[in-house]
Amino acid sequence: MFVLPDESRQLFKDPFGTLHRDIGTVLPELAGRTIYSVGDVVTHSLQQNGITPAIAVVDGQTMRSPCIKMPEIAGPCIHVKNPPGTITDELVSALTHAVDHTPVTILVDGEEDLAVIPLVIAAPLSSIVIYGQPNEGVVLRIVDDQAKTAARRLLTQFTKTESPIPHN
């Protein structure tokens, strides 16, 4: 398990890609691409626009409250535990498996926000990872070598632990 120390949390407030004010502005960029989504609202918005993400990572929450607009489950649903501020081995394993077995919905018990990092690492080149940036819009990240390197660099900010419970 990777645990994000409190002193490193601020590094993850900035968008990890290009910020767009609403989903409508990114739709043209998604045509013909493999799309991976993280977050209930962005996944629901994609589905409302006729796009089924190859992988949808959701947790039933929006800004720490129950999500009113739940996305539909596409393909098999993998349930994983991922406490806030962590990236569990279970989540990484599910993402790695899902990349080769799409479409898949990964339902997280805990928090899915940080799933963007291992998803960018696992996703094939030229695919797109899209996620919601609370109160700002959606973030689009085209997966290329630079994105994978940046994701691996962000992962170095975490503490690797074998403990199933984070110690913050």
Curated annotation (Swiss-Prot):
Pfam families: DUF359 (PF04019). Its EC number is 2.7.1.237. GTP binds at residues 40-42, 59, 112. It is an enzyme of class 2 (transferase). It catalyses: 3'-dephospho-CoA + GTP = GDP + CoA + H(+). The keyword Membrane does not apply. One of its GO terms (molecular function) is kinase activity. GO terms for biological process: coenzyme A biosynthetic process. Pathway: Cofactor biosynthesis; coenzyme A biosynthesis. Keywords: Coenzyme A biosynthesis, GTP-binding, Kinase, Nucleotide-binding, Transferase. InterPro entries: GTP-dep_dephospho-CoA_kin. Catalyzes the GTP-dependent phosphorylation of the 3'-hydroxyl group of dephosphocoenzyme A to form coenzyme A (CoA). Belongs to the GTP-dependent DPCK family. This is GTP-dependent dephospho-CoA kinase.
